[in-house]
Amino acid sequence: MRTALAVTALSLFIATALPAEMRAETVKVEAFTFAVPEGWTSVTPSSPMRKAQLEIARGPEKAEVTFFHFGADQGGSAADNVARWYAQFPGSEDKRITENVQVGPVKITFAMTEGTFNSGMPGGPTTPMEGYALCGAILETASGNLFIKMTGPNAVVKASTDAFKKMVTDGAKTAAPKV
């Protein structure tokens, strides 16, 4: 009994003594490992197409972060997907921001907009969701593009955008060759 108690106490001590970044939950998709930002929760993907899914709760409002990877030469180009994502927010043309970032060998395209989000599968029925926002990222790799998309109420997405971008850029570094 004393041994079990000692092991439990030691485990708790070690877990709390480690820096937060070493204790952080991670999500692995293909060659990338993403540290889940504090306050975000990893949940079971709601679709088999999703490789991982996170939830961000800010009071009663929730946003979701979804990860997709379809393989080499699958899922379309970064430009095609950014255009499709923006089309899910009709009338948002003046609020669209696209940024390109290079992290080692990984090209990242960030796409952000806000307005009424037409939620649903492409070509299927949609549900208009007013006051929503998008912050998406596409990581281009030889094994196929990785698509990461955060959608939810505008306030939640805007408050989470910096953490989202950090998660994505830090995750891109995990697949970059070590110098």
Q: What kind of region is each of these model predictions?
A:
Residues A6-A17:
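Bacterial N-terminal signal peptides
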Residues A17-A24:
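Boundary at the C-terminal end of the N-terminal hydrophobic targeting segment
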Residues T26, E30-F89:
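Secretory pathway targeting signatures of secreted, lumenal, and periplasmic proteins
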Residues E38, M49, V82-L139:
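Signature of long, low-cysteine stretches enriched in small and polar/charged residues
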Residues E38, S46-S47, H69-G71, M112-F117, ...:
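A mature extracytoplasmic/lumenal domain signature
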Residues W40, A142-V179:
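Surface-exposed amphipathic alpha-helical segments
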Residues S47, Q74-A78, P128-G131, T141, ...:
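Solvent-exposed, acidic/flexible segments
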Residues T66, T109-F110, L146-K149:
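Structural recognition of the beta-strand scaffold that forms the well-ordered cores
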